């Protein structure tokens, strides 16, 4: 039981970039935020920046790295003179199969039972990279993925933390003959992700955009440009 006043506290984790403008100050707690886009669009850089800002505030991050994209050197660049603090605050899981991904989430839940007060962020980068059809059919995958997302949301709510997932994209052809981008996982991941941000590559070198595709109380369709720089994102 809790007071409504406490549930309304605006305690977000900032990216310290222009992306915060469309998110209302940063990534929300007690929900799942999904960043999706093509390779190189900035998904992992955003999660690294969130982990650094979490450490700057004296809290831990659990980082489930399914693609091998978590670079110690990149974290060192973004962290600057607080690298040692950041390195001590990030707990990393590196699953090599979709089954191990589920086990990593279970172990994260067990970790939070004793470290929930000191942990503010759980990252799953990315949510579906490890799935292969040979591991099972689509219906069993959806069932397993739904269970994983349910567990992740339970962690966010029970321990008052932010849960962030990244996702890949694929192109679909609409009835009008035009190509559209859609995140992998379709309606299932959309159901669990109450905040969704699409990352786009611009036409000019280094140009990127973030578009708010789903949010409970922010203007959907809001779009900002951002850049990946040596010490993070702007």
Swiss-Prot record:
Record GO biological process: DNA recombination; DNA repair
Family: Belongs to the eukaryotic RecA-like protein family. RadB subfamily.
Protein's recorded name: DNA repair and recombination protein RadB
Gene that produces this protein: radB
GO terms of molecular function: ATP binding; ATP hydrolysis activity; ATP-dependent DNA damage sensor activity; damaged DNA binding
Entry-linked InterPro entries: AAA+_ATPase (IPR003593), DNA_recomb/repair_Rad51_C (IPR013632), DNA_repair_and_recomb_RadB (IPR011939), P-loop_NTPase (IPR027417), RecA_ATP-bd (IPR020588)
PROSITE patterns reported in the protein's UniProt record: RECA_2
Keywords: ATP-binding, DNA damage, DNA recombination, DNA-binding, Nucleotide-binding
Binding annotation for ATP: 37-44
Tagged with keyword DNA-binding: yes
């Amino acid at each position: 039981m809790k007071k409504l006043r406490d549930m309304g506290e605006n305690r977000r984790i900032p990216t310290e970039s222009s992306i915060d403008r469309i998110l209302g100050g940063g990534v929300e707690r007690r929900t799942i935020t999904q960043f999706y886009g093509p390779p190189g669009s900035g998904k992992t850089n955003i999660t690294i920046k969130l982990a650094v800002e979490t450490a700057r505030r004296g809290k831990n991050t659990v980082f489930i790295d399914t693609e091998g994209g978590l670079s110690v050197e990149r974290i060192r660049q973004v962290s600057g003179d607080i690298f040692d603090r950041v390195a001590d605050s990030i707990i990393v899981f590196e699953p090599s199969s979709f089954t191990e991904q589920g086990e990593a989430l279970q172990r994260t839940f067990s970790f939070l039972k004793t470290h929930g007060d000191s942990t503010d962020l759980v990252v799953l980068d990315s949510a579906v990279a490890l799935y292969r059809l040979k591991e099972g059919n689509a219906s069993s995958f959806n069932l397993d993925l739904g269970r994983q997302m349910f567990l992740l949301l339970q962690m966010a709510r029970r321990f008052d933390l932010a849960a962030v997932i990244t996702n890949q994209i694929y192109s679909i052809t609409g009835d009008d003959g035009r190509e559209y981008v859609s995140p992998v996982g379709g309606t299932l991941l959309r159901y669990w992700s109450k905040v969704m941000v699409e990352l786009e590559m611009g036409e000019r070198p280094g140009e990127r955009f973030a578009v708010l595709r789903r949010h409970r109380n922010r203007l959907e369709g809001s779009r900002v440009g951002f850049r990946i720089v040596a010490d993070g994102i702007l």
